[in-house]
């Protein structure tokens, strides 16, 4: 060691060197204590008791989000003590233990029995069930406000705002991989809502198998402002469509220079790029009839099922179910309205019931006083991030047929194409080409005839006929045992 110190002194004594600085640096190697690395402190390393104390200050949405971090957080965020406190604080202030039903007596008690007799997560589940039930009740109250002309809910926008409701589509490919598309544009009409989804990164059409439409709401909407797609949400399945062999299995609605339109029941329109044969956009047309119920009350795997109809049999009226229908009809192209009309006192004679249909003639070819002019040139507007267009000779039809009590009897919103008819107009008032438009679903069909007036550059509806399935009629009006209807083929027929 002495030799070592001597060498240090000799080195420090060399002329021209910074001896004092060097010696000070060397001495610091011996005098300075070693620096120990600081221990990383993170929330995951905290004791469970401390974490539970922190979690007890969080709201329900934050607790649900924490439960998705890892297994330990999930178990701690299920703590019955925390959720029982949230459940109790959510009760009406006037409620007391004695006023509550026996089922809920133990839910307010903060004693050991209410905590230890239940499995972890019990009170979380009870809290969520209670909040979701109260939310559904509050939203469904808004459905009861009806438009006197259409018989449909008139506070849909308010209900959407209260519930945080939105709609998404989920595309599933043949390998089982799902692609979620949330970005959308909404267009509200008198009786329907049109939703347009467009994206720059659609999956290849050839590998897609299904498309599912969901209504999406925050799990706890009162505590999510604004609603976040990363927060806990509820999904309500509204429709499922099969996309395999789309161009062969669906109905071609029309085309322009860029896209082709294909229709799938109920109410879906898929735009395909002509050049790439890939999806350009997806458009859903949703009728207001039971829209909120279908968007909220279903589950992620099962669609909402309306309660069974309980018709009353009228033994006095021999033509019960054949008269006093009302029709509200809208024709539009998503952004523009072409026709909005209401027709009252529609009826059908018994002799007009044939081939499994009840015929309701709305516009008669021979009665030119009821012919309807169309505003503008018929077409459906579409858009993406880059392009916009208008496919001509097609439109969206919103049909609302009310029965004699003013309740919705048959409703739909769907794209319809026009076709040039081979026959020429036999009307002296209108000389021009005739176009037809037909719609068919499981409940009936619609047939429309237009005449194109070259002089005024407009369409005129000269014929409009509804055909309602007699099977739907017998179920809705309980006509199974009516002998006077049995001879008029009130049975289900193939179209």
Residue spans of the language-model regions?
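Short hydrophobic alpha-helical "box" of cullin-RING ligase substrate receptors
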Residues: 45-59, 63-77, 83
